């Protein structure tokens, strides 16, 4: 596989959004449009890629830098894709892969509680569901999403994050 630029990576982030309802922990998943180039019709979680427009036209935190650019970008993607606001965003894990076009990609996966809003999907998604971890197993999820939901489920139920392993 030919890599375009070994130092250049596309950066994306995803959010495992949860809410506690009647003693159950539920997670929002969305079904991608059938017109999507990658994983059409499959189920996933909200997220997207970091673009310079996400921060370049905002006030810098220091003379030369923008702090929390990725978090602001992820919050914007969540609002855009499902119209929700979330609470504190916590780091879960990172994923790296190389797209078929040779572009290296870094995905940072986060988890956060639902805070407010009513779900309204954008044009990139055609359906959504709030599901428990066992219910999520019934959906055609993009590879790895179920395992990430399982990790968050264990964390939220008081199991040690360090004891959760993903095929290592």
What do these predicted ranges mean?
Residues 12-13, 69-70, 126:
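Short loop/turn microsegments at loop-to-beta-strand junctions
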């Amino acid at each position: 596989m030919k890599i375009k630029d070994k130092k250049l990576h596309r950066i994306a982030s995803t959010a495992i959004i949860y809410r506690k309802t009647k003693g159950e922990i539920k997670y929002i998943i969305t079904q991608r449009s059938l017109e999507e180039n990658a994983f059409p019709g499959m189920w996933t979680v909200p997220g997207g890629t970091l673009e310079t427009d996400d921060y370049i036209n905002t006030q810098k935190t220091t003379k030369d830098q923008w702090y929390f650019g990725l978090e602001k970008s992820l919050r914007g993607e969540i609002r855009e894709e499902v119209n929700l606001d979330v609470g504190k965003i916590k780091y879960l894990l990172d994923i790296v892969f190389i797209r078929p076009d040779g572009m290296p990609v870094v995905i940072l996966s986060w988890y956060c509680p639902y805070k407010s809003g009513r779900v309204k999907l954008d044009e990139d998604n055609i359906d959504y569901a709030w599901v428990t971890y066992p219910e999520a197993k019934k959906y055609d999820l993009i590879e790895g999403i179920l395992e990430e939901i399982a990790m968050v489920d264990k964390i939220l139920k008081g199991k040690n994050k360090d004891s959760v392993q993903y095929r290592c």
